Regions:
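Second-shell loop/turn segments in exported
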Residues: 7-11, 84-92, 102, 164-170
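Active-site neighborhood of glycoside hydrolase catalytic domains
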Residues: 97-100, 104-116, 121-122, 126-175
Length: 175
């Protein structure tokens, strides 16, 4: 928010924002914490502001984005309009990517690292239903899911009924 309106500010690659905050805090006798939007891969901004984050700048692969079980079928969160785009926590490449970021953060002299949004997508129980999650879930339960994802949740279902099936319990445990 600059001069009464939105303005996209370009960041420079050679300025270390975290170190600048750590230094300023230490000068005032304050401890610093690093916080990361852990499973967030980016944001598609409204109002023509564009997009930001590793899913948009090429750092992350599009296949890393969570897949949502919508009423119209399975959709990548990248194809669902504006808003926050989550990474799939079950994807090994995502985990390795995030561990690299955490390793970088751990090199700073901070009191701690806060893992915000270290969870599945904002779409209630509707994510992640990617092929990666299917394979990992089937390994977890030791059998194939015949009707994916309908054996767990019907298209667009975003809450649990009074009766929770064994497959739903297994899915929630897996997640």
């Amino acid at each position: 928010w600059v001069t009464g309106g939105y303005k996209w500010l370009q960041r420079t690659a050679d300025f270390d924002y975290l170190q600048a905050f750590i230094d300023a805090g230490k000068a005032e006798g304050l401890d610093g914490y690093a916080a990361i939007n852990t499973m967030v891969g980016g944001k598609e901004c409204p109002y023509g502001l564009g997009s930001d984050g590793p899913l948009f700048d090429g750092t992350a692969k599009r296949e890393w984005a969570s897949v949502v079980n919508t009423s119209e079928g399975l959709k990548s969160c990248m194809d669902m309009g504006t808003g926050t785009k989550f990474l799939n926590p079950a994807n090994d490449e995502v985990v390795e990517y995030l561990l690299g970021i955490l390793e970088d953060l751990a090199a700073y002299d901070v009191k701690g690292i806060i893992l915000d949004r270290c969870r599945y997508d904002d779409n209630d129980l509707q994510s992640d239903f990617s092929e990666v999650s299917r394979q990992k879930f089937e390994e977890f339960i030791g059998k194939k899911v015949e009707n994916w994802p309908d054996d767990i949740f019907s298209p667009g279902q975003n809450s649990l009924d009074n009766y929770v099936t064994a497959m739903q319990r297994d899915w929630m445990t897996f997640r």
